[in-house]
């Protein structure tokens, strides 16, 4: 009897111990209700808020697995990386120009934590959205040359901190022959970071291709070296590529102020575009496009062009499509070339509103270009224009006449690539992808903005019988888009500049264009630097712009009479 009692007590003890272990290990948390769980109520998984559910999934699964994972010898997790030791040796000394090295305020950059908090700038709908659980992992390729260590470190840490661990296969840093090899080498201690160093300066395109060739994941993510990734930035990008491997997708690029490093959310109503000078610009969506998105403001945005610094792409599609033009140098024009190539060869470009990544926008480059930045950009741009733009390349040469004098090298392999991929003509691109870009008419002598210094001729929103004025050039067309025709009319849509009174000081009016109306006849004189009214021999003048509008005055050397079209089609 005593023996049986002893056995029962032992069994009871083991049973209690087992229950305690079960509760402690989390298996009975639903039964226990948890601290503050509310009167022992069971928390049903289907009733948990989606965001909380996602966090629970990560914390109970991926992060636990990551914490148990053994790191390779010499590697550390990013929270254990010594930021002070890495950044400290390159900090700006007292009296030094904080902008000298990087063309942004390095002192402010160096003050920030490598994992600083930034505002979540996503739309509310994005914060409630659930992403596919079977997304492919990505290799993140970051190229740099003499980047500020604090900015480079924040880029790497933000990728690791703001991404589900299982979606980051690796971060490949390609050091494009920086002066100090340790800028990259020291970061190789961080988990998942691989460092490749060029043995000479190669430039952005060839460096990115080297990183892509070394990548082990099926999806490539290209980032600049002065970025900060926002909450759940990666999942929406990977999801779009997983659904269609011919999509090339970019986040909304938020602004990191170059002076104080404040993080500011960018508008979600922008698309990438360009003028005929082939310089990238941001275009606002048309009112019709904005209205069509009111029901789903976080839907992907088809964009004619990507900025080029930040995008995600299927690795095999990147290879099939011809990677980058390896004959392009340093920086510039590569986003133009890859955008044309993707669209014309069967792919598409998208901006994904639920993905946000901050980027430091600078006013000038901190590094040197062999032969000068203008020459390198013109050479790269000419290569893109000659391969992809067909006869429309002539509008580029009209906008940038000096580009004709810049040798662009051999493009035979790129022309063969275009033929092999059965790519569409540029006319198709203009009609189907970028109809907003105005194409000069065959009757036009000059086209585009009519510039006077930093100001441009502007309708000021006026219509028939309204005056015209000048306004700061915005490079967005619209009220500042004009054409000088072979019939000598200065046109804005169906309205023409009209001299109502042929006396000096008379205001110019917008009136409906009429054939053979002498009041609407203009010609360019003095090397296309002035506009003279044919009937009165008076010149277009802006001296009275602030007091009422533009006028005609006796032609003279005044700066108020200097005007230049962005495209002169007859040089």
Curated annotation (Swiss-Prot):
Detected in urine (at protein level). Widely expressed. PROSITE patterns: RICIN_B_LECTIN. Its cofactor is Mn(2+). Residues 300-362 are annotated as: Catalytic subdomain B. Changing residue 493 to V: Found in a patient with multiple abnormalities including neonatal hypotonia, psychomotor delay, feeding difficulty and dysmorphic features; likely benign; does not affect ApoC-III glycosylation. The record marks 516 as: Not glycosylated. Substrate binds at residues 143, 176, 201, 225, 331, 362, 365, 367. GO terms for biological process: O-glycan processing; positive regulation of immunoglobulin production; protein maturation; protein O-linked glycosylation; protein O-linked glycosylation via serine; protein O-linked glycosylation via threonine. InterPro entries: GalNAc-T (IPR045885), Glyco_trans_2-like (IPR001173), Nucleotide-diphossugar_trans (IPR029044), Ricin_B-like_lectins (IPR035992), Ricin_B_lectin (IPR000772). The chain crosses the membrane at residues 7-24. It is found in: Golgi apparatus, Golgi stack membrane; Secreted. It is a single-pass type II membrane protein. Mn(2+) binds at residues 224, 226, 359. Residues 25-571 are lumenal. Keywords: Congenital disorder of glycosylation, Disease variant, Disulfide bond, Glycoprotein, Glycosyltransferase, Golgi apparatus, Lectin, Manganese, Membrane, Metal-binding, Phosphoprotein, Proteoglycan, Secreted, Signal-anchor, Transferase, Transmembrane, Transmembrane helix. The keyword DNA-binding does not apply. Its main location: Golgi. Residues 53-66 have a biased composition (Basic and acidic residues). Pfam families: Glycos_transf_2, Ricin_B_lectin. Catalyzes the initial reaction in O-linked oligosaccharide biosynthesis, the transfer of an N-acetyl-D-galactosamine residue to a serine or threonine residue on the protein receptor. Has a broad spectrum of substrates for peptides such as EA2, Muc5AC, Muc1a, Muc1b. Probably involved in O-linked glycosylation of the immunoglobulin A1 (IgA1) hinge region. Involved in O-linked glycosylation of APOC-III, ANGPTL3 and PLTP. It participates in the regulation of HDL-C metabolism. There are two conserved domains in the glycosyltransferase region: the N-terminal domain (domain A, also called GT1 motif), which is probably involved in manganese coordination and substrate binding and the C-terminal domain (domain B, also called Gal/GalNAc-T motif), which is probably involved in catalytic reaction and UDP-Gal binding. Belongs to the glycosyltransferase 2 family. GalNAc-T subfamily. This is Polypeptide N-acetylgalactosaminyltransferase 2. It comes from Homo sapiens (Human). The gene is GALNT2.
């Amino acid at each position: 009897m005593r023996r049986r009692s002893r056995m029962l007590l032992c069994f009871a003890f083991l049973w209690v111990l087992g229950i305690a272990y079960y509760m402690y290990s989390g298996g009975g948390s639903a039964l226990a209700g948890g601290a503050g769980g509310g009167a022992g109520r069971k928390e049903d998984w289907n009733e948990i808020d989606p965001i909380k559910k996602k966090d629970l999934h990560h914390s109970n699964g991926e992060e636990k697995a990551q914490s148990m994972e053994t790191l390779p010898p010499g590697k550390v997790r990013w929270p254990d990386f010594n930021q002070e030791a890495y950044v400290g040796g390159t900090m700006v000394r007292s009296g030094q120009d904080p902008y000298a090295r990087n063309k942004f305020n390095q002192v402010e950059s160096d003050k920030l934590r490598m994992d600083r908090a930034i505002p979540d700038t996503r739309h509310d709908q994005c914060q409630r959205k659930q992403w596919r659980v079977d997304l492919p992992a990505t290799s993140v390729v970051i190229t740099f040359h003499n980047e500020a260590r604090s900015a480079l470190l924040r880029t790497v840490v933000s990728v690791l901190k703001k991404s589900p661990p299982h979606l980051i296969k690796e971060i490949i840093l390609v050091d494009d022959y920086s002066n100090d090899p340790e800028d990259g080498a020291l970061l190789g201690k961080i988990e998942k970071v691989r460092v490749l160093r060029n043995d000479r300066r190669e430039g952005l395109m060839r460096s990115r291709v080297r990183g892509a060739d070394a990548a082990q994941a099926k999806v490539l993510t290209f980032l600049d070296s002065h970025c900060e990734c926002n909450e759940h930035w990666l999942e929406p990008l990977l999801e779009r590529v997983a659904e269609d491997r011919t999509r090339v997708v970019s986040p909304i690029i938020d602004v990191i102020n170059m002076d104080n490093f404040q993080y500011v959310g960018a508008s979600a109503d922008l698309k990438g575009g360009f003028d005929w000078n082939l310089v990238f610009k941001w275009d606002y969506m048309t009112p019709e496009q904005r209205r069509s998105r009111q029901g789903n403001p976080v839907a992907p945005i088809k964009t004619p062009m990507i900025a080029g610094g930040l995008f995600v792409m299927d690795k095999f599609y990147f290879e099939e499509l011809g990677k980058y033009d390896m004959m392009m140098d340093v920086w510039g024009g590569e986003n133009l070339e890859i955008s044309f190539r993707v669209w014309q060869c069967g792919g598409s470009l998208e901006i994904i509103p639920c993905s946000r990544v901050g980027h430091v926008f600078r006013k000038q480059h901190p590094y040197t270009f062999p032969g000068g930045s203008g020459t390198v950009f013109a050479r790269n741009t000419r290569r893109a224009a000659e391969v992809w733009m067909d006869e429309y390349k002539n509008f580029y040469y009209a906008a940038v006449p000096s580009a004709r004098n810049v040798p662009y090298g051999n493009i035979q392999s790129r022309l063969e690539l275009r033929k092999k991929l059965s790519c569409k003509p540029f006319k198709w691109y203009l009609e189907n992808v970028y109809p907003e870009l105005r194409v000069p008419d065959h009757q036009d002598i000059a086209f585009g903005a009519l510039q006077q210094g930093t100001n441009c001729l502007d309708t000021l929103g006026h219509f028939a019988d309204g005056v015209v004025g000048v306004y700061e050039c915005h490079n967005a067309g619209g009220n500042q888009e004009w054409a000088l025709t072979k019939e000598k009319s200065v046109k804005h849509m169906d309205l023409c500049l009209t001299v109502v009174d042929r006396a000096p000081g008379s205001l110019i009016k917008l009136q409906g264009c009429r054939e053979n109306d002498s009041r609407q006849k203009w010609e360019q004189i003095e090397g296309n630097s002035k506009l003279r009214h044919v009937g009165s021999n008076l010149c277009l003048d802006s001296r009275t712009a602030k007091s009422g509008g533009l006028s005609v005055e006796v032609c003279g050397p005044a700066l108020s009479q200097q005007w230049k079209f962005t495209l002169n089609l007859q040089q």
